[in-house]
A protein has these predicted regions:
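Bacterial Sec-dependent N-terminal signal peptides
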Residues: 16-79
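Active-site-adjacent "subsite" loops/lids of carbohydrate-active enzymes
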Residues: 80-101, 178-270, 326
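Aromatic- and glycine-enriched glycan-recognition loops and surfaces
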Residues: 96-114, 143-173, 255-259, 340-344, ...
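Catalytic domains of carbohydrate-active enzymes, especially glycoside hydrolases
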Residues: 102-129, 270-274, 398-411, 475-481
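Aromatic-lined carbohydrate-binding/catalytic grooves of carbohydrate-active enzymes
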Residues: 116-158
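Aromatic- and acidic-residue-enriched segments that line the glycan-binding/catalytic groove
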Residues: 131-145, 186-240, 279-320, 374-385
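Substrate-binding cleft/loops of secretory-pathway carbohydrate-active enzymes
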Residues: 186-190, 194, 285, 355-424, ...
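Substrate-binding cleft of secreted/luminal carbohydrate-active enzymes
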Residues: 394-509
């Protein structure tokens, strides 16, 4: 009996330290909470959650596996009401699913029984490598995760098709299956001494694709910041950047665009409900990137003149924030970056639909539109003119809204437990309500919370809030809602609380 009790204590401790990163959510003083800058992006984190134990590799001592409760058989049926989706982060759930089709099948049954109508399965995490068949990118074989008291590499030794396993299980129980990809991500410099991993670290020909950042000591490739201390990053004027974490591509690089379009074409071969772009943006340096020669040539073409002092005519070394509401050149830089993301999304939508006309195409974004321009993204409709409401917005910024190229949008309404109802932007309800006029009817959207990382959620025990959360999100988004992330539902055992909230919603129809 004592042994069993000890095992459950170990599992509880591991759960407390898993899933520690989220999809992006920023600081806002109205929350009274400390929030990290984007791991950005979603469904946009982190940037990397982690999870309960499973074998790491044959040579690593194994801890007890996460217990899986048996689920009753599920008969597919027509869903009632709006969409109810759950995000399944690759790294955060790798221990459970990387080497077990059975666990995928069992949890998909439980997801269905809880009242969800679909899942969003992450198939390209921040260290790059994919969990689907691709002629473009290597298969993912490992992620960094917390194992036996420290971060270690968790390896995938099975060769079954990870994404297809979710699709098959989804069809069996009647769940929609979306696949998400961390898009403008080139690799990851992992913490706790694990070091670099991913495409740009394993392929020297790709290193020129990485963002070039404007620092106090000149222009530096993002990989040159690997492992630097917080103090050193402050000296370089990039305090919001991290010495560890995801490294980003330059979205203006034509070779990057071609590579990612081929990757998405591979993904579109699957019988999916849809494809969702995550972290389809610039990196976490405000306006500090990308200042490569590639971007300089494209920016000069965009404005129709040469920039004599690069990058000083736009931003002084180490400066990545607007001067007031932005100088004329800074506003041109803002529009240019939004155009680069817009043009990629348009091309990606066209490429995906050329392979699979019936698939839904969309993106995850943070719902905080008022400051999301720092990520180089205008996720609104081109029919919405932000310059009417926001002094930072250039007159042409509306031209680079990309919502009209999407079939669905996922917005992260990542407010804390004390900010669920409300009309302001920094509440779950407000996030969801305020998105509708921005999309201007161009695209249906779902919104939802991060129930593991936002303030008030980090220690669990918030099941009583699920009816309030469901009401705030599902009734104020045109298509429905989502939860981030499945690992948090499992960690804090929110299954019954969410089921009750969904049942209450369906009874109201």
């Amino acid at each position: 009996m004592k042994t069993i009790r000890n095992i459950f204590c170990v599992i509880a401790l591991l759960c407390m330290i898993s899933c520690e990163d989220a999809k992006e959510y920023p600081w806002n003083p109205e929350w009274g909470e400390i929030v990290e800058k984007p791991k950005p992006d979603t469904p946009e984190e982190p940037e990397t959650p982690v999870e309960p134990e499973t074998p790491v590799d044959p040579e690593t001592p194994q801890d007890p596996e996460t217990p899986v409760d048996p689920e009753p058989p599920v008969e597919p049926e027509e869903p009632v009401g709006k969409a109810r989706l759950v995000w399944i982060d690759a790294a955060a759930n790798f221990n459970d699913y990387a080497n077990s089709k059975n666990k995928i099948s069992l949890d998909m049954k439980r997801i269905k029984n809880t009242g969800f109508t679909g899942v969003i399965v992450d198939v390209r995490p921040t260290n790059s490598g994919v969990l689907f068949e691709s002629d473009t990118e290597h298969a993912l074989t490992r992620v960094d995760a917390w194992v036996s008291g420290s971060y270690k590499w968790v390896k995938r030794t099975s060769d079954f098709d990870y994404l297809q396993a979710f699709i098959d299980a989804g069809k069996e129980v009647g769940l929609d299956v979306y696949a998400s990809v961390n898009t403008m991500v080139a690799g990851c410099y992992c913490a706790y001494g694990l070091g670099p991993d991913g495409l740009v670290y394993n392929d020297d020909s790709k290193k020129s694709w990485v963002s070039v950042i404007n620092t106090t000591e000149g222009l530096m490739s993002a990989v040159d910041l690997d492992g630097l201390s917080a103090e050193r990053l402050i000296e370089l004027g990039v305090s919001e950047y991290r010495g560890t974490g995801a490294r980003f591509f330059n979205p203006a690089n034509d070779e990057v665009v071609a590579y990612l379009l081929n990757l998405l074409a591979d993904l579109a071969e699957y019988d999916l409900t849809g494809i969702i772009l995550d972290r389809c943006r610039y990196d976490d340096t405000g306006f500090g990137s990308d200042f490569s020669d590639v971007s300089r040539a494209k920016f000069e073409d965009f404005i129709g003149s040469k920039v004599e002092n690069w990058p000083n005519d736009i931003f002084a070394p180490g400066v990545a924030r607007l001067t007031g509401n932005g100088t004329d050149m800074q506003k041109k830089w803002m529009s240019f970056r939004a155009k680069m993301i817009h043009d990629f999304v348009e091309a990606a939508s066209d490429r995906v639909h050329s392979v699979n006309p019936d698939i839904r195409f969309g993106a995850y974004v943070g719902a905080w539109y008022s400051s999301y321009y720092e990520s180089g993204v205008n996720w609104a409709s081109p029919n919405y003119d932000p310059s009417i409401s926001y002094r930072w917005a250039p007159a042409d910024y509306k031209d680079y809204g990309y919502a009209d190229h999407c079939d669905i949008m996922i917005i992260g309404a990542y407010a804390g437990t004390g900010s669920i109802p409300g009309s302001g932007e920094w509440t779950m309800e407000g996030f969801c309500k305020r998105a509708e006029p921005l999309f201007a009817g161009d695209v249906p959207y779902v919104g939802g919370p991060d129930i593991g990382n936002s303030t008030g959620f980090t220690n669990g025990g918030q099941g009583h809030l699920m009816p309030q959360i469901v009401d705030a999100c599902i009734n104020n988004c045109t298509e429905g809602m989502f939860f981030f992330d499945l690992c948090h539902i499992k960690m804090y055992d929110y299954w019954s609380a969410i089921k009750s909230a969904f049942d209450k919603y369906k009874e109201s129809l």
